[in-house]
Amino acid sequence: MSAIIDAKKQEVDIIAEQLKNSVSTVIVDYRGLSVAEVTELRSQLREAGVEYKVLKNTMVRRAAQQAGIDGLDEFLVGPTAVATSTEDVVAPAKVIAGFAKEHQALEIKTGVMEGNVISAEEVNTVGTLPSHDGLVSMLLSVLQAPVRNFAYAVKAVGEDKESKEESAE
């Protein structure tokens, strides 16, 4: 018996470590999805660098307590799968929210972003945000716009002077 308990404690420790190290976690109820749909979801999550596991509620509850995350107990009812990402905050929410739109059977229970529990609505909202790279490129284009406009203005002034000089000759 103690070997089984030790194995379960190790599994809880692994889950707790995942929860601590992840910048984003989404907890879902996958009931009603076919095997093909779950496989499709797993492959989409894997492509985005997100780890997806079906876990026992008791183990997730104990791991969350160990990781210092409060407020998950009410969501850990029924079939539970956990998607975690250690790199991209938006990736799990983006993939799961998109998949949930196409497959009504997938229900988002809750999420954890940087240690804070968020609602299913907030997970959907985060899912609509662009990725980190997308946000960086948007910021860079906004920062480049004034410089680009200034360069166009300088070029236009130079062309205007050239045309005046040519017409004066």
From Swiss-Prot:
This is Large ribosomal subunit protein uL10. Belongs to the universal ribosomal protein uL10 family. It comes from Staphylococcus saprophyticus subsp. saprophyticus (strain ATCC 15305 / DSM 20229 / NCIMB 8711 / NCTC 7292 / S-41). One of its GO terms (biological process) is translation. GO terms for molecular function: large ribosomal subunit rRNA binding; structural constituent of ribosome. GO terms for cellular component: large ribosomal subunit. Pfam families: Ribosomal_L10. Forms part of the ribosomal stalk, playing a central role in the interaction of the ribosome with GTP-bound translation factors. Coiled coil: none annotated. Keywords: Ribonucleoprotein, Ribosomal protein, RNA-binding, rRNA-binding. Part of the ribosomal stalk of the 50S ribosomal subunit. The N-terminus interacts with L11 and the large rRNA to form the base of the stalk. The C-terminus forms an elongated spine to which L12 dimers bind in a sequential fashion forming a multimeric L10(L12)X complex. NCBIfam families: PRK00099.1-1. The keyword Nucleotide-binding does not apply.
